[in-house]
Every structure is written in C-alpha cells, then in structure tokens.
Amino acid sequence: MFARHERRGGRGGRGSGRGSGWNRGGQGRGGRPGSSFPAGLRGKEIGLYFARRGRARKEWAAAHQKVAVSIDPESQQDLQQIIHSISLEEGPSHERLDSINAVAVEYLSSAPTRLGTRGVGGELKLERNAALDEKLYQSLEAKAQSREYQSMLDFRKKLPAYTMREQIIEVIESNRVVVISGETGSGKTTQVPQFILDSYIQKGMGSLCKVICTQPRRISAISVAERVAAERAEQCGDSAGYHIRLECRAPRDRGSILFCTTGILLQQLQGDPYIMGASHIILDEVHERDLQTDFLSIILKDLLAVRPDLRVILMSATINAELFSDYFGNCPRLEIPGIAFPVEVAYLEDVLEQIGYRGNSVYSRNAGIHWKDRKKFESMIQDAMPFIRSLEGKYSHRTLDTLSEWNELCIDLDLVHALISEICTKKPEGAILVFLPGWEQISELNKRLKADSGLRGSSLIIPLHSMMPTVNQRQVFDRPPSGVRKIVLATNIAETSITINDVVYVIDCGKIKMSNFDVDKNLATLDAEWVSMANAQQRKGRAGRVQPGVCYRLYTSWRESQLEAYQLPEMLRTRLETLILKIKILKLGSAEAFLQKAINPPSSEALHLSLQFLITLKALNEDETLTPLGYHLAKLPLDPQTGKMIIMASIFSCLDPILTVAASLSFKDAFMVPLGKERLVDEAKKRFAGNTKSDHIMLVNVFSQWEEAVKKRDGNEFCYANYLSWNTLKMLSNMRQQFAEYLHELNFIGSQDIKAREYNQNSDNLKVLQAVICSGLYPNVAKGQFKNKRLVRCSTKTDAKAALHPKSVNVSQCGFDTQWFVYYTKIRSTKTFLHDVTPVYPIPLLLFGGFFRHSGDTITLDDWITLQCDDNLAELIKDLRQEFDRILERKIGAPGILAGTISANQRRLLAAIIKVLSTETAFVPEMPDNAFDEDDMDVQVIDET
C-alpha cells in the first residue's frame, strides 16, 4: 500500500547483535552523567550555569519553534465560498445546531433496540418445560451407561472437588451467593458447573438450568469447555460450550453450561440487563482482581436485589476468599483441598550458603549501583541489617557479607545461572521453571545458558514469552528425552495460564512486571515490582504438581515478610475511560457513585482524569451524559480513542487501512521476536514502514502484503521470512471484519465489505490516514525537537522529555518534515517512552484538537500546542472548525439517515478539507547546538516487556 516492501530471503543469523548503546563520554567535575558543565565552575556557579542555559532554551524555543500553518490561496478561497454558501442555505448556527440535536435525539431513542443482542443467555427467561425436562433426564441416564462416560467419571471421582459433590450442591441450593475456593488441580472449574447441571436434570428440572461461567482468558474458556464436554462424553456445543470474542460454540439454550470471557457477559448486559436467560452465574478466578471481573461483581451484587431466582458462585484461590465473602454479605465459603505434593522452600540466604556464591558480579556489587539509586540501595541495606545480624552463627561469614551488600534492585543472573548449573549437576531429574520479570532477562539468561558448555547436550532451554514464536514454545508441555533436563524461562504467564506437569524445581526471582497508572502524572507505568504472597504461593505450587519439589526464592525470608498479600487490583492501576462508557451505556448512573460500590473503589482523582479525557474526546458532555459519539464508542469493542478512529475512517473513506490499525492497537502487532534475531525484526519493521515514518502505517503495510501473499498461496513463506505470526494476522483479519460489522449495525457503512470502493476512496492517501489517526489519538500529541532533521527528543504537554520506544520504526530516523507526532500510549519504565507513533501536520491538529485560542500571529490548542498563523487564515480555520464539527455532529448523531442531513455544500466542504489535508506541507525548526544535554538522544534502551 505504502512504500512497497520487497521480501528478503529466508531468515539468517543475527550477526553481531545490538551495539553497546550511546557512549556518553566524560563527565564534568562533580557532575552527573550526561550533565557536563564547563571546567572550573564550583558550587553556586554550576547552578547559575544550568539556569542560564535553561532560560536560553526557552527563549529560543519561543522565538523559533512555532511552525507556520499554510493553506494555498486557491484552497482558502474555495473554503471561504463553501462556508459562506452553507451559512446562506441553512440559517443561523444556533438553528442548525438545534436541528442536528433533534435528529440525534430521535436516532438515539431508537438505537438501543438494534445492538446488544449478541447474548450469551439464550432465551430471555427460563420457564419450566416438562417435555424438555424428561428428554434431558433420559439423555443423561443413557449417557451414564456408556463406557466413555464411565471412564471419565472414574477420573472425575479422584478429584478433590468430587468428594465434596453433595456438600457443594447443598450450599449452592441453600444460598444465593457462595464462595468456593481451592488450589489449582482441585477440579473446581470443571466440576462445580456439572454438579449444578446434573442435579437439576436428575430432579426433572433441567429446563430451568443455564449455567454461565466466566473466565478471564480466552484460552481458558475454550479449554475448559472442551474438557467438560469430553467428561460428559459429548461434542463441545451440546450441553457444554464456549463463547469468546470472534468465536462461539454455544451449547443448547437450556440444560447447559456456557464458558465465556468476562467481556462477553458484559456485552450481553446491553441487550439483557437482568441476564434473565441464566439460572447460575459463576465468576471464576476472582482472586486475580482483573478490571472486568471486579466490575461485573458490582453489577451482580445489585442484580441479586431484582433477581431472587439467580444464584451467584464466586470461585477463587484460597488466599483471599474471605474478601469476596465479606463483600457479598458474609456469604458461605467452601474450601476444596488441592492435589499437591510437598514443596521445600529455600530462600536467598540458603541458596548462597548451599552453592557458595559470593556475589562478585555487577548485579550485587556495591560499585554497580547507579548514582540515582544510591540512596534507595543504602536504605534497603539498612532496613535488612537487623535480619542479617540475626543470621550470625547460623550461616557462614561469606554468606552474611554477601547479604550485607546485596542489591535487590537488580536480578542477579549470575546467581540464577549458578543455581541452574547446581541443580543440573547435583539434583535428581525434573524440569526447572525460572520466573523472570521480562524479555530482557529471559533473553540474557538464555544466551548465557546456551553458551555454557556444561549444559550443552544435556539440557533443553525453552524461553516462554508472548513476543516469541509459539511453535517453539509448544515443547514446554512435552517431556524431554532421557538424560535431558528441561529448563523453562518464563514470566508470570507460567503462574496460572499454563501448567507444566514435569516441573520439580522452581526458581523465583521475586519480581514481576506490573502495569500501573500514576494519577499525579497522568501516566501509565511499567516497572518490575516485588511479587505478592499470592504470586509467590502460585509459583511455589508449580513445583509440586506430580512429585515433591523445591522452590528457590532468590530473596530473603525477611523480604518475604515484607511482601504484600496480593497485587493491587487492576481497577486501582489502570485508566477508567472504557469502564465509564460501560457504566453509561448500561444506564448505571453516576460513574463515581457506581464505582464506590466496588470491592476496592478507584480514587476520585483517577476517575476525574478519565471523565475529563472522555469530555475532551467529545464522548461525554460536561454533565457526564453520553454524546452521540460516546454512545457509539460504548457499543464498540475498542478503547474510546481507537473506536473514534474507525468511525472517522468511515467518514473520510479510508476504512480498510484504519481497521488494520485499530485491530493491531487493540490486540497486538503480528511480529514474533526469536531470541538473537531482535535486530533483524527491527530491520523488517523499517522496511515495511518505508518512508512513511509511521508505526501505524507499517502495520497497514504488513497486513496488506500478507493478504496479497495469501492470495498467491504464499502466506506461510511470507510470515516466516518476515518474522510474522500467521495466527496473529488471522486474528487481526477476524477483528477487522468484526469492527466492520459493528460499523454496519451502527449505520456508518452500508455493507460489511471492508474492501468496497465507496469506503476506501482515500485509503491510499497517506496524509488523510495520518489525519484520521490523529483524530482518534488526540490529545496524545508529542512535539519533536531536531538537529539536522534527526529527532533528538520529544516533549508532551506534561513531560519535558520523552523518548520513542526502541521498537518504533522512527528510532534513529532522519528527514522528518513535521515536528508533531501522535502516539497511542505513553509508558514510563526505564524512561518515559512513546509507543506507536505517527507524524502529523498542523491542519489535522487544528481540526481535531481541543480548546482553540487565537492571539496575534499565534494559534494555541489546549494551552500548549502553538502554531504561527496570520489573522485572515486564523479566522478561516476557526470557521472551518465550526462547520466541520457540525458535519461530524450530523454524521455521528444520525449515521443511518445521512442523505437527509448532509447538504451538497457540506459534502463539498468535506472534499475540500480532504484536498487541504492531502497537500499540506510543513517544516522542522532546528535547535541550536547548546539546546541539548548529552543524554538528549533517542538511545535504544531495551524496555523490559
């Protein structure tokens, strides 16, 4: 589509690998790294030097960095004439606005009946059907006589849950809400729904039973449904089935069990707010405290007041079952014992003592502490000293000395390597599972182990990460040949999402990558944090699945005593925009009042930030009511910004490529990163991007070229040559079609044909695509600062310094012709990174931007984006914004009746806007040499993901 990408040959080696990064050179006397100052300065003089330099930068930027807005004279004249014609034919602006609002109100009043009917509950109300009851009973009785069913039943009877069958049925029948807890392997997920269903069928009431069991992950919903169907000697889709996004094998309407993702049940609420088609709702894995499950818990608690016949069962790990019981009015709790062998726990002090590790690497040596972390390190050691002294006489002086300078801020991969070698040479057979925080540690440890001649030939090393090819990871479930030890390097995905049965040894490094939201800085963060006790227990449990095991915790027993009981609930560490739109579309009242009913309510500050963001996005009015745009965004299975983007794509006739962008942003890009091939993957991305300098358009080119390869029956080779996942691309294809179906049902497009010419007249127009991406991502805007047209650093409204993420195609790029960028997310990890970036020109910012102020020769948007513009053009742009907003209000407020609401002149105006967007040019102001510190470089720092 853009900048044709020629396929390279097959995959080769990585070559020399990544370079050593930017060499910062020397430091000024007493100065910090990257903050040098002239020699000879002392004390106050140093501060004055930096203050003068800061003032000089600001003065220069104010004088030179305003980019001029430019529209050619002919286009200006056309726009003025069209705007004038519109004002003559439609009357005063307030009358036009009243007309638009009337149409929108009429549209929205009838809209709810058209969507939200993709339910999981089947019939709206369960009513007794004697004939069906008898049929279900006879079917179950006949099936129970089969050899296949009896074989499965023998297995089921060995599960701890089955031994409590009568007790479980009794407590569910006697109580409206029950909490059932049990460790992995107890059988609660597969058995409890069957106990309920079989009890109803055997009592001749099968027609009154419909069990819906939510799962936090897609793969869990599928695998559990298929397992339950097998245990019932049936095909999936008979009495047990599943429903996940883009895939459904639903069971019969009555006398059945449906396993679905939590999001699917929330979607059902739009068409069936009382879930009348369900007799029992089971929330599984509630201890994970994901956002959607906590949200659904609030709804179910309220729903119990109007559904006296509904039964709610919450299933949890044992560690915090009491919390959910308290939330639901001290409802009964049942605990199912798990199947687990004893697991010995060894702490850091034990490991150091056992293997004689001295800690002589940069990970643990005091000299390896960065100056920024020095105080934190010293405080950490001071806190631990009483514990270290308590070990005197129990451990060697060598161990105590090592502990007294141990750096907990890092993962000591030398120690992990040494411990693995110790296990491989001295311990009985059994797989080793190593828990690491992220990609960087997995990659580095994998490299070290592969280079270890002592392990070569006698070990099978399997890195496990979402960025890696799944074909290699399938080995994780297979037992290796005799004499070969399996070593799995994984993130927290191996805590609950997968089970590796032959693991005997677990090495827990004690850290986990957690996404959080810094309310004060309005910034997402991704940092390595200490695990919770819940995480630690889950990790320990991986070692005792099939025989006694050992869990090596590479942190002290004192550190364990400081761990939190569980990780912070997702509702307290994420943005709330999507949740607020759900509250509004379900008519649940004030967002703040509703969320105050949560188990752990979010802060009022976090809620206010999200409300203001939705108001800026024009999804909510100031009184917190849904706008027509907000109504549509709430209906779409996308975050608000991406949802707005695809709506704008339907208006600007560039549907196909923008659907690809939306699918990739809401799921993931299709690239897989084999260990050792990181640089080759980066090069492939840049080839796909061509000269577009856009991470988003790069994704468009990947998908469109894959489609072409598939048509030529060359898809697999294309994926292999370019480090792409066929499964991910197929998922993106299905998501694109789903988005088109939603747009069709919302009447933004007349058919579901993504490729139809009428929806893609501007799909090959790069600048229109950039503008539409801007329309969705605003206010996520960054300003680039350049030297020799090379991007040196970025700034945002709230961050003086931000860097492009190393995975961006724009890292180290030159030749930019605009200083403005839009980005999808901003995350602070090792530094503040901008993810998924596209350059954008001034006109899209002016059209889609926020608060507009014109003074002198300057236009200011949202009090920080400044553009240079003469008075006449500024007035034209102001009028253009007003008329363009009215077009959007009409198209979004009543998409199904566009022909009657959009005049010929307004269509002319939209065409003229597209012409202006297509021909706009800009320039990049250069910064002077003294404007940058030495660390103002887009250094490729590998972010740990």
Regions found by a protein language model. Name each.
Residues 670-727, 731:
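Accessory helical subdomains and C-terminal extensions of nucleic-acid helicases
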Residues 700-703, 710, 719-722, 728-741, ...:
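Phosphate-moiety recognition in structured ligand-binding domains
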Residues 431, 485, 658, 818-819:
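Short, surface-exposed beta-edge/turn micro-motifs
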Residues 764-945:
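C-terminal accessory domains/tails appended to large, multi-domain proteins
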